[in-house]
Regions:
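Hydrophobic ligand-binding cavity/cleft-lining segments
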Residues: 1-48
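Short amphipathic alpha-helical segments
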Residues: 15-18, 130, 134, 138
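Short strand-connecting beta-turns/loops that link adjacent beta-strands
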Residues: 15, 46-48, 75, 99-103
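Short, surface-exposed coil-to-beta transition loops
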Residues: 5-7, 63-67, 88-93
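Hydrophobic pocket/interface hotspot
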Residues: 18-23, 29, 53, 106-108, ...
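A structural signal for short, well-ordered beta-strand segments
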Residues: 6-12, 55, 94, 108-110
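Beta-strand/loop substructures that line and gate deep hydrophobic ligand-binding cavities in soluble
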Residues: 81-133
């Protein structure tokens, strides 16, 4: 296995600013993103947002740690790139689209290269399970988090 990733979207019954408030608060990810075990801020910007974080993820075959640098483009794009970690490379983003009528489309994109050793562990059905957890599930998790806060 070389690269792993993909893109998935969900339409959320909330305005873009409410969705952005959850997306940009990266330190609460363990509260609503499955597989995110821990996250801690190593650097912050002038607006006190975490810009460099260490993340521990449970990717089914083992726990992996990565240091990720975030770039904020409020209120529609949060992107990241791995600077150091157990994986060979990771890039990703959340892109929010205002659909009007207090609705937002959230698209999650992830591209990762687990490297040779970890890649040998992630094959076949395991690869499908990892992709489902790390990519396909994310928009639904965000939808559930945002819509539950609006109640």
């Amino acid at each position: 296995m070389a690269r792993m990733g993909g893109s998935a979207s969900a339409d959320i019954e909330a305005p873009v600013d409410e969705v952005w408030a959850v997306v940009e608060d990266v330190l609460i990810a363990p509260d609503w993103q499955g597989g995110v075990v821990a996250i801690s801020a190593l650097e912050r910007d002038a607006e006190d947002r975490a810009t460099l974080v260490e993340i521990e993820n449970d990717i089914k075959v083992r726990h992996v740690k990565t240091r990720v640098r975030f770039r904020y483009e409020p209120p529609t794009v949060l992107s990241w790139i791995q600077e150091q970690g157990d994986l060979k490379s990771v890039t990703g983003s959340w892109t929010l689209e205002d659909l009007g009528d207090r609705r937002t489309r959230a698209t999650y994109t992830l591209d990762s290269d687990p490297g040779r050793v970890l890649g040998m562990l992630i094959r076949g059905p395991v690869e499908a399970a990892v992709r489902a957890a790390l990519v396909n599930a994310r928009p639904g998790e965000l939808k559930a988090r945002v819509e539950s806060q609006g109640r």
